[in-house]
């Protein structure tokens, strides 16, 4: 380089205006004009002085001399015959040229095999030197350097196998180097230099408007190792080298250090070039490298260098508006420790810009440092029209495809974008930031992928930490940076099978199988689906101390605040907002034990948001088959401090697994919100300790405002699978070829182990026996206790204001809360001032807990909560029902309330029902279990028309009276609307509180027992007792539980004494006590409860049981015998015959046996008995009640039956009305045959045979005020009929047909229906004699009827029977031609007719099955009807086409009707009566429209529509429609 400074300047005139036009700007290069010399066209060459212009047609050979032997200003290229230079002195050589060189290229120029590397100071084959010490200013000079200008289509330059020891073996210029309009193409092959620029070296290079560029196998041997790539990335250049340092500063027409390739219309290829010890395997530039508006493919293939395997530049590198770009097999071989930056294909200290190109493919590029394909300060890929593909790129450090220091922007591309098969230590696809692997701080950058139109995919990228790499962060299988945004893209976004394999390091952030961001991850406003599938974060073995001293065991590795996880995404804040469908499927996370020790937070099989995760406003969200495995790993699908799922069209978390908490998701610090979504589903998720579906360790789970159904189904929290899985992983190290299969099967094995653990002890025998187990250690016992929340684990759970049903079904937990657990499993996890609570409020749909369970463990008896385990439970303000069905647990089949907890239930707009819940500890029925000594019930409230229903027992672990608790209020006066029912059925409930019924009713039904320490009833409130029910007052002085003596409270009931003349039953412990145990004024006894058809023997009276020795003061008691269901008098077993009904029994309990209260005390009571009135609408047994008497401590009343009043819904009208419907089907078929098969049109073809078929249907409604005594019905039927008829003689037709149909009848007043299916067979005939048309037919039908009748609380019955019907008809019609209509092929007929119809329908006797069963004797209905009518026909005939349209009006009169049989008996009541069908009007008015069209002599179609009503005077009692359509084939 130093020798160049000794060469003096050589210059020639070159138009400034032309160069300015060429080089004005990148965007202007496409419109450059021809180059000029001295103002003349290049076609008019002007030679000045010695000929320094290359005249290609005169070249015979080249004279090459030593650079050192040349005088100042002499040239390397000399034109002439070599013989003319022999034996001549140097001074005979062409003289000095005053200006630089301009070469006009007309024909191909080929230089080959010039080797000057043995000359120490050999320069390029064609050289231009400029002195750096010119006295005169150079600003005025037109052009400096070398320019080649093509002058024809053949103009081409080929430089092959040219070698030199200095820079630019083929072309060297200390100034500019320009190629213009070289239409024969440029080729540089196998050129090499021991310094920079294996082929060309210049201050700047422009290749413009040339026909292609081929650069192959050029090399530079210059050594840049050890120098900082940041100082001079543009040092090297296997083929081209451009730098501004060759001649110092000057006023440049093209910026120094730039290389521009523009507007070329041929292929551009750089292949096999190398700078093995420098940068830029093909091109190295100290300035910019620009490829602009080239029309054909530009490719860089298998180039290699330390940094920038193809291109290295200290400033920007841009490819704009080009055709297809291909970067394949390029390699940056320099390592970071040797100062190399990387960039397997491109490396830049400025911005790498790929814009407006027709396609980009980067394939199999590699870097031993960063950026397998591209490295730059910034990287922008935008506005490209064709696909952008990065495939199988590899980097040893960051960015398998792209590494940038500040920003990577991929925007506004028109076609698909794909990153596939990349590999790196971090950022397998893209890494953005300034990284340090030596323990220094890393500054991360931003990745923005937005507003692209095509699909975007990242697949099969891999991060494998083969060494420590950068220390602060590890991961990002596809993308790695500080802030990552994917927004407003129009195509599908796919992240598939991206994998991160890293080892743990103290205090770091590890993971993100697809994306790792230390700041925000924003995926927003994308128009098409987004899927993360098969991404993974898996551990690698830790490096040894010898390999990496940073892991010195002497320093220790304490727990840190590091984070690990995110099988798909790991970011500090993750926001997935307002997208189309979002899917996370089969993503997985595996963490080693070492990693769990080193890092403070591990988890998120799909997503780990270190601070927060928001998934809001997406059309649908699905997390399926994700898992997070390893010690202490939570969030099978999602882990974050706070989680928000809001405003999504649907949310689905299914089959996710975590080895610690949150099988689906975990919020580790704050709340988890499921708000304002559509359909929400959590199904088949598995967790080990905290929450099979959701874990929220320190916050609330809020399920609020969702517009669709919310379901938690088949989620499991169980421990036992983990030990098995870990052992398998540790014991067996699979072969490399088996690893992928093992990963795929891991999820299935883990799930099966969950199911096995969940089933192993769930089903115990009814007596509670389990197989004996060996004793276990306290440590193991403590470990077993830590499992809760089959669906949800949280501090508090709020289920509020949802619009559709919220369902928890078949969820399972080992220990606590089969569906929901709130609270803490460890003392150290409890938060001051935060009381565990479940709130269910304001929901419009039903809230259902069904089939949930927690396992029985004999070593942990004080556990449970089949559906819910909490401290406080509040259910209020719901307009839907809240249902607890068939849940099971060790204790608290439905709900377990922990000590100091309370329950507040309000049936507001729906019922609250506990049914079928059971527990092992209660040995059966168990609705709510109250643990400890302080848990209690605050209030049970129900609004009018609604109820709280306990089919199962309320169970208290400790029956010591709750002295500190308030009285249990039933329907508190705080709300006047609390007038509903609190209902206990079947089970025995012991409530260690005093009960105060202030409004509404408390009902003990179906043998229920309710025990309490006191009972008070306010005026207006009801106490309803059914037969066998017991209201029991617990004895405060009697031990009721092992180790507990009960003491009497001092103030349970508000009244302290009984005022004189009070109207109530007032019972105290003894005569001296002024506080009552019982204060009741009215007892209502349910009449319907005393007996049923299944009961036998003596009826047990309702009981009021008080402690032995209790004192009854005088007072009045009203006892109402009530008909609560309105069907009390339908109690056949009780009221069918004379009976004594025990209304009430008063019993005193003692230590040994129950005894009656003293006769004296009972006789002092003034009991007023009121029996239910028999009103006009009271149905059932009629009779008289006697005066009530007390007999042996029991209040008894007698019944004397006098008769039975039949409920109209039992009259059986629907059975008899089915006879009418039987005839209706036969009549509809008859009318269709008369209208379509027996017509004058049919008679036109003598001796023809017709095969026909049609569909038919009808609808009838029969009801009227004057028919109210017998139930009306709505009937509908539909079917198909087919037949054949033949014309035996002229105008005589005989035919047969068959039909099948389905139908249904519904009662108009009652809940009864009949389903019908039947068949019909018919024969028919017609004879046309002049104007007279005779028609006749006979039909026989059979119908199978299936009836179901529902009687509400009385049950339902069903029956089946077969009915039959016969219909015979004869009709005579007179056809009168009114006259032809113009044109003459129209004809109009007026046809009056009369008909006689005989119908007979019957059914055999049958008996119903079920409750309120009836027996029907056989019955029949026979009638004769005479219809009269007229028909208007308009016929159109033209050739073989014939169409007849008709309008018929008829009036039918029923001349004869007879109903026979019909006796009905209500079997249980022993009551019979005569049934009958509706008394329909005997007139019927019909209007029919019909069309018969013969399209040819072979084919005909038919269509008919009929409407009818019940005559002129009763049109509202009978209304119906019939329709038919079909075709005829004529033979």
Curated annotation (Swiss-Prot):
One of its GO terms (cellular component) is extracellular region. InterPro entries: Autotransporte_beta, Autotransporte_beta_dom_sf, Polymorphic_membr_middle, POMP_repeat. PROSITE patterns: AUTOTRANSPORTER. It holds the Pfam family Autotransporter. The keyword Kinase does not apply. Keywords: Cell outer membrane, Cell wall, Membrane, Secreted, Signal, Transmembrane, Transmembrane beta strand. It is a peripheral membrane protein. The keyword Transit peptide does not apply. SMART domains: Autotransporter. It is found in: Secreted, Cell wall; Cell outer membrane. Residues 1244-1531 form the Autotransporter domain. Belongs to the PMP outer membrane protein family. This is Probable outer membrane protein PmpD.
């Amino acid at each position: 380089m130093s020798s160049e400074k000794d060469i003096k300047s050589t210059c020639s005139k070159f138009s400034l205006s032309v160069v300015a036009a060429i080089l004005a700007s990148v965007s202007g290069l496409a419109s450059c004009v021809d180059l000029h010399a001295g103002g003349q066209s290049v076609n008019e060459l002007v030679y000045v002085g010695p000929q320094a212009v290359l005249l290609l047609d005169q070249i015979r050979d080249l004279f090459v001399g030593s650079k050192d032997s040349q005088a100042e200003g002499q040239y390397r290229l000399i034109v002439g015959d070599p013989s003319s230079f022999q034996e001549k002195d140097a001074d005979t050589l062409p003289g000095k040229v005053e200006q630089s060189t301009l070469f006009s290229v007309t024909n191909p120029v080929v230089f080959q095999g010039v080797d000057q590397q043995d000359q120490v100071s050999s320069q390029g084959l064609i050289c231009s030197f400029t002195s750096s010490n010119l006295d005169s200013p150079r600003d005025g000079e037109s052009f400096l350097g070398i320019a080649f200008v093509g002058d024809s289509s053949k103009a081409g330059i080929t430089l092959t196998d040219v070698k030199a020891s200095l820079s630019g073996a083929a072309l060297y210029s200390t100034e500019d180097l320009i190629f213009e309009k070289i239409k024969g193409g440029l080729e540089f092959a196998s050129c090499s230099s021991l310094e920079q620029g294996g082929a060309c070296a210049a201050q700047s290079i422009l290749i413009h408007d040339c026909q292609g560029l081929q650069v192959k196998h050029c090399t530079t041997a210059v050594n840049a190792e050890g120098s900082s790539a940041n100082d001079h990335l543009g040092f090297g250049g296997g083929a081209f080298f451009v730098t501004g340092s060759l001649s110092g500063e000057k006023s440049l027409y093209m910026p120094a250090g730039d290389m521009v390739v523009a507007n070329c219309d041929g292929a551009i290829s750089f292949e096999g070039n190398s700078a093995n010890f420098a940068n830029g395997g093909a091109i190295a530039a100290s300035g910019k490298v620009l490829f602009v508006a080239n029309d054909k493919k530009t490719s860089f293939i298998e180039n290699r260098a330390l940094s920038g395997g193809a291109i290295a530049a200290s400033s920007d590198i841009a490819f704009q508006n080009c055709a297809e770009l291909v970067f394949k097999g390029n390699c940056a071989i320099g390592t970071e420790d040797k100062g190399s930056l990387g960039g397997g294909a491109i490396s830049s200290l400025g911005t790498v810009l790929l814009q407006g190109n027709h396609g980009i493919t980067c394939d199999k590029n590699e870097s031993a440092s960063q950026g397998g394909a591209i490295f730059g300060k910034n990287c922008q890929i935008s506005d490209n029209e064709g696909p952008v593909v990065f495939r199988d790129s590899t980097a040893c450090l960051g960015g398998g495809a792209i590494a940038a220091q500040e920003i990577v922007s991929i925007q506004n591309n028109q076609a698909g974008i794909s990153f596939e098969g990349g590999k790196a230590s971090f950022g397998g696809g893209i890494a953005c930031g300034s990284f340090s692997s030596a323990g220094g701080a890393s500054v991360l950058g931003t990745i923005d992928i937005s507003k692209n139109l095509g699909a975007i995919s990242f697949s099969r990228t891999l991060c494998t930490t083969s060494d420590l790499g950068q220390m602060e962060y590890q991961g990002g299988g596809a993308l790695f940076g500080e802030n990552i945004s994917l927004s407003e893209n129009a195509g599908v976004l796919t992240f598939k099978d991206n994998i991160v394999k890293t080892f743990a390091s103290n205090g770091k952030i590890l993971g993100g199988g697809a994306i790792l961001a230390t700041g925000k991850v924003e995926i927003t406003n994308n128009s098409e689906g987004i899927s993360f599938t098969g991404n993974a974060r898996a551990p690698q073995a830790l490096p040894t101390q010898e390999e990496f001293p940073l892991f010195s065991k002497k320093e220790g590795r304490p727990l840190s605040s590091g984070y690990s996880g995110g099988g798909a995404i790991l970011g500090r804040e993750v926001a997935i907002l307002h997208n189309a469908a979002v899917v996370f499927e089969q993503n997985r996370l595996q963490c080693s034990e070492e990693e769990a020790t080193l890092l403070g937070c591990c988890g998120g099989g799909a997503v780990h948001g270190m601070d927060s995760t928001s998934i809001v406003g997406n059309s649908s969200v699905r997390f399926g088959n994700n898992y997070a495995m390893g010690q202490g790993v939570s969030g099978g699908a999602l882990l974050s401090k706070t989680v928000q799922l809001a405003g999504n069209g649907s949310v689905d978390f299914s089959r996710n697994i975590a080895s610690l908490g949150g099988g689906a998701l975990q919020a580790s610090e704050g709340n988890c919100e499921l708000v304002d979504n559509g359909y929400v589903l959590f199904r088949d998720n598995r967790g080990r300790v905290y929450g099979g579906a959701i874990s929220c360790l320190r916050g609330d789970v809020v399920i609020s405002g969702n517009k669709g159904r919310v379901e938690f189904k088949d989620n499991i929290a169980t421990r036992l699978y983990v030990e098995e899985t870990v052992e398998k992983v540790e014991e067996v190290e699979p072969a490399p070829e088996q690893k992928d299969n093992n990963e795929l099967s891991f999820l299935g094995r883990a799930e099966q182990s969950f199911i096995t653990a969940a089933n192993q002890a769930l089903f115990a025998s009814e007596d509670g026996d389990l197989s004996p187990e060996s004793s276990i250690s306290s440590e193991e016992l403590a470990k077993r206790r830590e499992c809760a929340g089959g669906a949800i684990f949280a501090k508090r759970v709020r289920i509020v204001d949802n619009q559709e049903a919220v369902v928890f079904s078949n969820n399972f937990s080992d220990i606590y809360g089969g569906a929901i657990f709130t609270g803490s499993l460890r003392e150290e996890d409890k938060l001051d001032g935060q009381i565990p609570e479940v709130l269910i409020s304001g929901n419009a749909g039903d809230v259902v807990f069904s089939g949930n369970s927690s396992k029985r463990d004999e070593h942990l008896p004080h556990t449970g909560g089949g559906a819910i385990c909490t401290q406080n439970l509040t259910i209020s303000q719901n307009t839907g029902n809240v249902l607890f069905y068939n849940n099971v647990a060790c204790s608290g089949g439905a709900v377990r309330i922990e000590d100091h907890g309370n329950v507040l239930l309000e049936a507001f707009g729906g019922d609250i029902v506990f049914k079928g819940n059971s527990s092992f500890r209660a040995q059966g029925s168990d609705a709510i279990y109250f643990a400890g000594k302080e848990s209690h019930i605050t209030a049970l409230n129900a609004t009018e028309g609604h109820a709280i229903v306990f089919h199962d027992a309320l169970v208290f672990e400790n029956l010591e009276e709750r002295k500190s608790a308030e009285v249990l209020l039933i329907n508190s006066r705080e709300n006047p609307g609390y007038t509903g029912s609190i209902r206990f059925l079947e089970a025995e409930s012991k409530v260690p509180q005093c009960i105060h019924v202030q409004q509404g009713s408390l009902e003990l039904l179906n043998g229920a027992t309710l025990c309490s320490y006191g009972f008070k009833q306010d005026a207006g409130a009801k106490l309803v007792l059914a037969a066998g029910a017991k209201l029991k007052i617990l004895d405060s002085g009697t031990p009721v539980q092992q180790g507990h003596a009960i003491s009497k409270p001092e103030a349970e009931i508000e009244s302290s004494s009984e005022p004189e003349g009070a109207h109530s039953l007032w019972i105290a412990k003894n005569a001296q006590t002024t506080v009552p145990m019982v204060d009741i004024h009215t007892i209502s006894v349910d009449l319907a409860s005393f007996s049923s058809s299944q009961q036998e023997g003596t009826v047990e009276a309702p009981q009021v049981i008080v402690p032995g020795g209790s004192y009854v003061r005088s007072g009045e008691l009203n006892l109402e015998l009530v008909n609560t269901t309105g069907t009390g008098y339908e109690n056949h077993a009780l009221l069918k015959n004379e009976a004594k009904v025990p209304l009430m029994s008063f019993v005193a309990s003692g230590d040994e046996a129950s005894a009656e209260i003293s006769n004296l005390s009972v006789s002092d009571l003034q009991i007023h008995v009121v029996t239910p009135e028999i009103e006009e609408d009271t149905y059932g047994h009629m009779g008289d009640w006697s005066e009530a008497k007390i007999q042996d401590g029991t209040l008894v009343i007698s019944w004397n039956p006098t008769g039975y009043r039949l409920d109209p819904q039992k009259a059986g009208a629907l059975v008899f009305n089915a006879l009418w419907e039987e005839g209706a089907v036969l009549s509809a078929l008859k009318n269709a045959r008369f209208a379509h098969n027996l017509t004058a049109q049919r008679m036109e073809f003598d001796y023809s045979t017709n095969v026909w078929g049609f569909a038919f249907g009808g609808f009838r409604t029969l009801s009227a005020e004057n028919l109210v005594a017998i139930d009306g019905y709505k009937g509908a039927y539909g079917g198909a009929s087919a037949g054949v008829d033949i014309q035996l003689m002229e105008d005589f037709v005989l035919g047969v047909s068959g039909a099948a149909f389905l139908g249904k009848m519904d009662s108009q007043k009652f809940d009864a229906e009949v389903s019908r299916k039947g068949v019909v067979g018919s024969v028919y005939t017609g004879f046309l004699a002049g104007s007279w048309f005779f028609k006749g037919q006979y039909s026989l039908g059979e119908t199978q009827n299936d009836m179901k009748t529902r009687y509400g609380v009385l049950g339902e019955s069903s029956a089946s029977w077969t009915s039959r019907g016969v219909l015979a008809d004869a009709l005579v019609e007179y056809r009168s031609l009114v006259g032809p209509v113009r044109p003459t092929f129209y004809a109009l007929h007026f046809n009056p007719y009369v008909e006689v119809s005989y119908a007979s329908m019957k059914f055999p006797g049958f008996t119903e099955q079920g409750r309120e069963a009836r027996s029907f004797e056989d019955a029949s209905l026979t009638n004769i009807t005479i219809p009269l009518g007229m028909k208007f026909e308009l016929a159109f005939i033209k050739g073989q086409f014939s169409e007849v349209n008709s309008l018929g009006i008829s009036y039918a009169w029923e001349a004869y009707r007879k109903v026979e049989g019909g006796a009905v008996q209500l079997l249980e009541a022993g009551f019979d009566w005569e049934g009958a069908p509706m008394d329909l009007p005997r007139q019927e008015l019909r209007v029919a429209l019909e069309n018969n069209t013969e399209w040819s002599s072979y084919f005909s179609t038919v269509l008919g529509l009929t409407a009818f009503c019940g005559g002129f005077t009763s049109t509202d009692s009978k209304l119906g429609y019939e329709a038919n359509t079909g075709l005829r084939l004529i033979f």
